[in-house]
Amino acid sequence: FFGAADFRDITLAVPVSLGRLPELFDFAQQVDAFHLLVDSELAVSSVSAMAVDRAQRASVFLKVDCGYGRAGVVPNSPHAFRLAEMLSEAEWIDFRGLLTHGGHSYDCKNRDEIRAVAVQERLAVVGFADALRHRGIVVPEVSIGSTPTMCVTDDLSGVTEIRPGNYVLFDQFQAAI
């Protein structure tokens, strides 16, 4: 969809489905930049193996769970550190950094609750990025975003990218929360 509309820098903002890797690697050759998300050792190994087999670089973010509990690694956990190390050491992977989504902000009932999620969202990835950098791992990007949290946040320190999905349209659903 986005590639057909001539978008040239695309992030698949959900952890990669391993069965779709061949299709995704093909698509990556049609745009200027295509970034995948991973949150498991199997995903890192599978993306790395396909990149090697195809002699095609893969741009990959590590998905971080900032409290939503749906996907991503728990920041500062041994598992999270291991995956970041695997990504940074993989020969054919360009480790893009950390990405999170405060999806639980959609369950909030007021601005104060949303603001608390916004703080949690930012601190989860910024703190983890700092810990990785302390270990010598380069973390180029720190990406956050949900429309509700972007509407109330006043501190983006340490963040390099925001992705407030439907912020530009701000539909009735957004206005309701």
Model-derived regions: residue spans:
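Active-site-proximal beta-alpha core segment in soluble small-molecule metabolic enzymes
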Residues: 1-111
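Active-site loop/helix belt of alpha/beta enzymes
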Residues: 59, 65-177
